Structure formats: structure tokens, C-alpha cells
Amino acid sequence: MNIISNSCIGGFLMRDYLKEKFNNPFIWSYIDNISFFNLIKNYENINWLNFELIKDKNWNFCILVDNLVKINYPHYHFDPNANKITFFDDDNQHRNVYYNKIWEYIVEKYKTRTERMLKINVKPIFILASCYDG
């Protein structure tokens, strides 16, 4: 199954209810409205290997896929003191990740999950769970 949501709900569904491996790069992310529309409209034609990691001066970051879809990862945090990957589950059962190489970790997860998504080659079920301005 390939569930793609514009919020963290996809991660909860895959982890807590379906008990499946995360098989797309949209797990624990949010996607703004324009990017989500672009994703739905262009899903079959997106070049998933054409992506870039974008960072700002406030340690925020996202992955821009094929200049169409911006994936934001609010649960992944840069921590200069975290020499190894540290997980922390907050009160809302979000799994937050802290690491001093968080950007490399995000890119690795993006590549691994994208590869898995392309390999299973299953049409996605899109879930619009929230509206995000972008």
C-alpha cells in the first residue's frame, strides 16, 4: 500500500494501523497546498531522482522534488551535540529525530523510501488531512 498524505497522518496510518514499512518519502512530513496539488496532478511524470535539499539560516530544511513538490520535515531537527541519531516521541506520538548530520539523514531516508516506492509501483492513495499555505 502507498499512502501519501500532506501531513503526518500518513506516518500514523502506516505505523500504527497498517503496521507496514514506510514506503514513500512523505512519512512524517507536511506538504503545502500548491505542492500537494502538483504532486497529485503530476505523480506519474515526476522525476523522483531529481531533488535537492534546501536549508535556511534558521536550520529549517525541505526537499524539493523535480521543482514541483516541496516536502517539509518538521520532526527532523539539527542538533549540533547529537553525534548519533536520537529519537524522542513527543506527547502527540510524533517521533522526532535529532542529529548533527540531520541533512545527510534526511537525504538517505528520502532515497531509501523513494526507491522502495518505485519498486512496489503501487498507485498511491492521497489523503488531504490539513491545509497548509505555502
Listing of model-derived features with the role each one plays in the protein:
Residues 1-134:
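Extracellular glycan-modifying ectodomains
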